[in-house]
Structure formats: structure tokens, C-alpha cells
């Protein structure tokens, strides 16, 4: 069988650690579930998913891996799609679970693609760089708290499950990775979510500035004063100091009273 060659331009680091694969699978209820795997690489984790899942759909952008995967998983309950996940369309009405081992450069884009289609999914298990995992689960008043933290925690209950060292991959990455779980919240509203993402993105446009100096780029002084008076904010408050509930209320106030 042809040996897979990792492509640096795609940020490929293939999982090779059986214990990590088993640990990932332990965190998912695979019984009678349809799974989407983003970037199955050599199919190492795919093997473990196929043992328990009803069906696995794998998106793999690297065309050189497709014949290897097709040969390895012949006659299995698996569909391999040679396509960029960012271009994917989802038709099934049954909610699926997503498993992904993502390179740093595309993590946010893929997450927001999933968020935009939230009604199609119920859970994500994501392997990312450890620093990205810290941003996803970050709390207010911490250095890693960001618009990614807010978006992730708005859409789901997020947990950092465990750290994965470089030795678990080929080739070895230079930094640790971590596995994060997203359990999607019930009763999400697409328009409210879109508004929340739009608003919080602008609040964090310049992270080192005060909230006021971020808002001034799309609001006038009178509008900002209306917000500050209603929420009784200190003039020098920064975006990182406000929690998720406050941002939800802020976005709601903006779209119902100012926009």
C-alpha cells in the first residue's frame, strides 16, 4: 500500500497513537450515530469510529490520500468525499456528530462553518493546537478570552478534555494539541446567533482598546452613552471583562434599541 506523505501546506499531522484514538472515541456515544470526520488523513481514527458508528462520512481535501483510504476501507460503512469541508452542503435531517483534527490556520473558518449550520449537528469533538483550545474554553478577564471564546460558548457547552503531546503524531508538531468537546445548546435561533457573532466580532476588533473605543467604529457617542448608561459600565471597561450573558444582553439591546 502506498505510504501517505504529509503535506506541510495543508498543515497535516497524522494521528498515530492508539490510546489517544480510543480516548477520543470514549467521549462520544457512537451507537446508531452518523459521524462526520473532517480530514481523516491516513484513516487511523476512522478505524476506531467505524467499529461502533452506524455510518461515517469523511471529508478529505488531499486527493492523494483518497485511493489509500478507499483501499483500506473497502466495503465498510464509510463514504469518502474528496472536497474542502468549507464548501460542503448538508442535506440530512438527522443531527450528526463531527470529529476533526484541524490544522491551526483553518480552525476558526471550519468552526464558524459548523456554527452556521448548527441545526445539522449535536456535538463536535475537536483536536486543535492547545493554545486554540484554551481560547475556546477561556473565561472573562483572562488573556485568552476572545470572540472565538464567546462564539463557541454561545453555541455549545465547551470542555477541554485532555492534552495530546507531539509524539502522538507524524510528523511531530512543535506544540501540544488538545481535544475539546462542544455539546450544542438547545433552542438556538439562527438570526439571534448571526446578530451575536456580528456584534461581538466588532467589540473585539481591537483587543487592546477599551470597549468604548471599539464601539466608536460603528456607533456614535450618543448611542454608546445610551448603552453605557443602561448597563452602568465604567468608562474604561475592556471587552475581555464582560461575560457571555452580558454580551447576549448587549447584542439584544443593540439590535432592539439602537440598530
Swiss-Prot record:
Domain of life: Bacteria
UniProt keywords, alphabetically: Cytoplasm, Methyltransferase, RNA-binding, rRNA processing, S-adenosyl-L-methionine, Transferase
Primary location class: cytoplasm
EC number per UniProt: 2.1.1.182
Disulfide bonds: none
Reaction(s) the record says it catalyses: adenosine(1518)/adenosine(1519) in 16S rRNA + 4 S-adenosyl-L-methionine = N(6)-dimethyladenosine(1518)/N(6)-dimethyladenosine(1519) in 16S rRNA + 4 S-adenosyl-L-homocysteine + 4 H(+)
Subcellular location: Cytoplasm
Pfam families, alphabetized: RrnaAD
CDD domains in alphabetical order: AdoMet_MTases (cd02440)
Residues annotated for S-adenosyl-L-methionine binding in this entry: 13, 15, 39, 60, 84, 101
Cellular compartments per GO CC: cytosol
GO molecular function, one term: 16S rRNA (adenine(1518)-N(6)/adenine(1519)-N(6))-dimethyltransferase activity
Record's keyword annotation contains tRNA processing: no
Statement: the UniProt record of this protein carries the keyword Methyltransferase: yes
Family: Belongs to the class I-like SAM-binding methyltransferase superfamily. rRNA adenine N(6)-methyltransferase family. RsmA subfamily.
UniProt function note: Specifically dimethylates two adjacent adenosines (A1518 and A1519) in the loop of a conserved hairpin near the 3'-end of 16S rRNA in the 30S particle. May play a critical role in biogenesis of 30S subunits.
HAMAP family documented for this protein: 16SrRNA_methyltr_A (MF_00607)
NCBIfam families assigned to the protein according to its UniProt record, in alphabetical order: ksgA
Protein name according to UniProt: Ribosomal RNA small subunit methyltransferase A
Source organism: Mesomycoplasma hyopneumoniae (strain 232) (Mycoplasma hyopneumoniae)
Amino acid at each position: 500500500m502506498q505510504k501517505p506523505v504529509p503535506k506541510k501546506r495543508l498543515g497535516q499531522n497524522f494521528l498515530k497513537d492508539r490510546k489517544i484514538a480510543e480516548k477520543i472515541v470514549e467521549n462520544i456515544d457512537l451507537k446508531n450515530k452518523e459521524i462526520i470526520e473532517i480530514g481523516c488523513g491516513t484513516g487511523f481514527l476512522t478505524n476506531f469510529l467505524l467499529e461502533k458508528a452506524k455510518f461515517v462520512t469523511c471529508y478529505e481535501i488531499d486527493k492523494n490520500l483518497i485511493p489509500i483510504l478507499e483501499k483500506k476501507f473497502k466495503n465498510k460503512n464509510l463514504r469518502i468525499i474528496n472536497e474542502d469541508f468549507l464548501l460542503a452542503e448538508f442535506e440530512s435531517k438527522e443531527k450528526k456528530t463531527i470529529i476533526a483534527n484541524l490544522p491551526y490556520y483553518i480552525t476558526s473558518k471550519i468552526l464558524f462553518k459548523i456554527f452556521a449550520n448548527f441545526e445539522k449537528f449535536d456535538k463536535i469533538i475537536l483536536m486543535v493546537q492547545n493554545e486554540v483550545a484554551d481560547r475556546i474554553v477561556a473565561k472573562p478577564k483572562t488573556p485568552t478570552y476572545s470572540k472565538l471564546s464567546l462564539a463557541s460558548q454561545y453555541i455549545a457547552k465547551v470542555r477541554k478534555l485532555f492534552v495530546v503531546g507531539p509524539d502522538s503524531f507524524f510528523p511531530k508538531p512543535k506544540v501540544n494539541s488538545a481535544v475539546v468537546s462542544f455539546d450544542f445548546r438547545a433552542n438556538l435561533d439562527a438570526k439571534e446567533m448571526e446578530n451575536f457573532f456580528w456584534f461581538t466580532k466588532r467589540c473585539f476588533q481591537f483587543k487592546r482598546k477599551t470597549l468604548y473605543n471599539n464601539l466608536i467604529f460603528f456607533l456614535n457617542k450618543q448611542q454608546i452613552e445610551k448603552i453605557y448608561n443602561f448597563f452602568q459600565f465604567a468608562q474604561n471597561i475592556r471587552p475581555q471583562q464582560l461575560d457571555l450573558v452580558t454580551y447576549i444582553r448587549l447584542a439584544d439591546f443593540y439590535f432592539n434599541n439602537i440598530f
